[in-house]
Amino acid sequence: MTAWTLHTCDRLEERYWETHHPCGLRILVSPKKFSACYAVLGVEYGSRDRFAGGAVPMGCAHFLEHKMFERADGSGWEDVFAALGAEVNAYTSDDSTAYMFSATEGISDALEALLTMVSELSVTSASVSRERQIIAEEIRMNADDPWEVVYANMLRGLYAPTGNRQQDQGHPLRLAF
């Protein structure tokens, strides 16, 4: 790794350290006096990202976010983190996907688990089929949430037909990628 650089914001009384791993991963560390430790691993790939020709279906980033939680043996990473006394979660936005955990002990083991989780992808036909159903249910739940409906309508009104106005999860009729 390269040297660490200290960044400060006097106005907010915040500081964080930054370095870059040889693989290109940008690492930020912000020491806090909390009883719990929080770690976030984010990638710059979100719901609006496309490749030439639109070859990536809408909702692909969200689908991959979900799939990262499944282990090769079919079990879930949630169980691994729970056994370590940690909580794990993730989210997909229009421009990024982030995986995170919080823990009060066993931080090194939880960090190792997070790095392993995002490094190993297990996809089978059966797991894709199961995940489609889970994401379809998420989409239905959001369609029944007034706040989500207002937000989606606002995006459609503000943006031209681009990824910014689309649902992060994809469209229920297009879940058959």
What are these regions (language model features)?
Residues 72, 77-177:
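Acidic/histidine-enriched segments that form metal/cofactor-coordinating
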